[in-house]
Amino acid sequence: GDKNQITFTGRVQHLQDGSVRYDWTGVYMQTRFTGSRIAAVLSDEGTSYHNVFVDGKWIKKIKVSGKDQQTITLADKLAKGTHTLRLQKCTEGEYGCTTVKELIVDKNATLTAVKPKARFIEVIGDSYTCGFGTESNNRTDPFKLETENCNQAYGCLVANYFDADYALVAHSGQGITRHYGDSVRVVKFGQSVELCG
């Protein structure tokens, strides 16, 4: 799809073949579509988890793993009419970088980009922003990718409260001037840098 069909918010890389690649936590893609189903052709350079929202409601969390393209059904058996999809990367870029190749909808269905909101918030943070352990049942659990979910952390909660679009610039253990437990005052993010939204 093109910018008239799909909206990306956050730091992403637009590739020459039309695919879009991203690794930062919290990056999200939105589109309004007609029809009863929508699927995505995705791949990942590691492993990433994504939240799927349809018409503003959380539907499920999906896992994208491996460089081979996979077609993942995001929603199906929807009522007739126009629906809004939001696919949000909810885990950190250190563990996976996702590529969206295409969206698949019903025959004769349409895709329309979602207009940006009036407000935009950029949150710079660390593991609190990334949602480290937000889906864990025990606060002393070690890091697990499957229990990290930025959508349940303060940055996304504040943005949702104020009905704002957002971008998260966050990495567990990395600070603006110093990393956690590190005396070196240099920060280097090895992730994508193009900001969309």
Positions of the model-derived regions?
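Conserved SGNH/GDSL esterase-like catalytic core that processes O-acyl groups on lipids
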Residues: G26, G93-Y95, T134, R139-G197
